[in-house]
């Protein structure tokens, strides 16, 4: 979360941000603290309700959350729906890690069509260790395992995304590996030029 937030403006007053796959709402709250108007969306109504409840409590105890006039609207639903309108920035933290290369590229393309400045996302980078773990995970019955990570080769993903969005003025920006304990992801920024 800290890496993706570091790629966003410190002052987000007057900017609209989509937190696509908001989970518990931690990133949405930090964007609000910077003054952003945030739409925090997740497929899980349970997570959205948890995020909404935590946010209500945090507003009571942390006056810095609303000091710059930001706001958060929490919603359970499809992050790719055009009904949500346009945004200045979009963040998809760990919401695309279960998808294959083409599906990620399609999602990024759909989001860039409604975004003015940047789309930030994470994906599960291909590595020999993850490839072995992924193969071993397929040995277990589907009902006994958690959602499957899709290890992605960043060079292939780059080709797919660039092919989809380059003609609309989008270019790759920052890229950083994020590791903490067993967690590893690749964070990537695409910017409109």
Q: Where do the protein language model's features map onto the residues?
A:
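Conserved alpha-helix/loop element of class I SAM-dependent methyltransferases that forms part
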Residues: 1-13
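Short alpha-helix
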Residues: 148-166
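A conserved beta-strand element that flanks and buttresses the S-adenosyl-L-methionine
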Residues: 91
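Conserved beta-strand signature within the Rossmann-like core of class I S-adenosyl-L-methionine
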Residues: 116-124
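Class I SAM-dependent methyltransferase SAM/SAH-binding core
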Residues: 18, 26-65, 69-78
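Conserved glycine-rich SAM-binding loop
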Residues: 23
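Short conserved loop adjoining the S-adenosyl-L-methionine
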Residues: 81-85
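A short, conserved alpha-helix within the catalytic core of class I
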Residues: 99-110
